[in-house]
Amino acid sequence: YESPNMVNWIDKNDMPKANGNVYESPALDGVGIWVENKVKPIESGKSESELREEIIKVLEETGTEIIVSYLPVGSEKATQFWAQVCLDTNTAFVNCMPAFIASDKEWAQKFTDKNIPIIGDDIKGQVGATIVHRTLARLCDERGTKIEKTYQINVGGNTDFLNMKEQERLVSKKISKTESVQSQLTDRLDDDDIYVGPSDFIPFLGNTKLMFMRIEGRQWANIPYNMEVRLEVDDKANSAGIVIDAIRLA
């Protein structure tokens, strides 16, 4: 309930007490330049190797079975750190952000060799922007039309969108989302004819995510058509409904 968290589905007074503890871990590249003034990790001065040893000890002592990563977009080093921790402790890994672990052949093979569940990468909401875009793109393709251009623009007001103002952190995110749509098409679009990704941070939107999507193409007799969709969802509830099933599967 502390800022900058925006999840308030249950009234604070109705939330039961929890026994979970918060432990320090290396921040690595987990905090981007746009969120530095909102998120200040507590750092004890311990080295990465010291913290790693402490983390492994806690995981073993608590009998942890699954690690769920909701690290900020662009946390490549931090994601690899936790993936390796999972391998070293035989812990399942649910990667909810677009750093390539499950979809990387080398990393995936490491998990396969040790028979450790790995689920990811990234996450599609229950009725989220990308799954809607994928479904409509596939529909147009299956109905025999020729998609010529498409875009999907997402805006929101939580720290996820604030973090994504840093373009350097978006490389894997845009690849993940763009490929998700391209994979539904019989004929891939040229890079200049497809755009899928976050557009901007609008503070007053809070946890509300808005998606604007457009598909342009041609149907029978080479006649042009287009469609536009506006989607409004609670960004985190949309995500949580899917990751719960991923945890059950792991």
Where in this protein do the model-derived segments appear?
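Generic detector of short, locally flexible boundary/turn motifs and exposed helical patches
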Residues: G32-W34, V58-E61, A83-C86, K114-I116, ...
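Metallocofactor- and cofactor-centric catalytic cores in central/energy metabolism, strongly enriched
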Residues: Y1-A92, M97, I101-F111, N226-A250
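Active-site-lining helix/loop region of Rossmann-like oxidoreductase modules
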Residues: N5, V127-L249
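Glycine-/Pro-rich loop/turn segments that contact NAD(P) or position catalytic residues
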Residues: S75-K77, F81-T89, V94-E168
